[in-house]
Amino acid sequence: MDTVKIKDKSFRVSIPEAEIKERVKALAEQMSKDLEGKNPIFLGVLNGSFIFAADLMREMTVPCEISFVKLASYQGTTSTGKVREVLGINENLSGRTVVIVEDIVESGQTMKQMIESLGTRNPESVRICTLFFKPEKLKEELNLDYVAFSIPDDFIVGYGLDYDGLGRELKDVYTIVE
């Protein structure tokens, strides 16, 4: 499938499944080395990161836990910039190495709020792992520890990312066709 139609928009393949798998495996290898002996807990940001987080966990070679938090800042194809926590964190993070697993970092506002909320839980350290990063959209100063793909400022769907709730099941990543 080179192109797909979701609702009123058309999308074309931009990152094939094989390339995603290769990058996720490479990221997991690096993270496994970095996190050896650190008792990490991954916090996947729902809904977009659930496929990435699952694939990443399966490739890890060190013991780690995973939990999920739900935040929202999107409406349609644009970020609202307003973040609201929907589902909180129940795990004790004190003294733990926390790895936030995100599908995409754009402005950085969601990530900044997440890091601030984690700070009150006294983690040993907080690292950020994102599947996609749009450097030209970044408004907040962030240290992204692990980035699978730096991409241009185009709207994408697939591999967990959606357009109004649709398209998450696509194995490839698709870019909107203007």
Region spans (language model):
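PRPP-associated nucleotide enzymes
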Residues: M1-E178
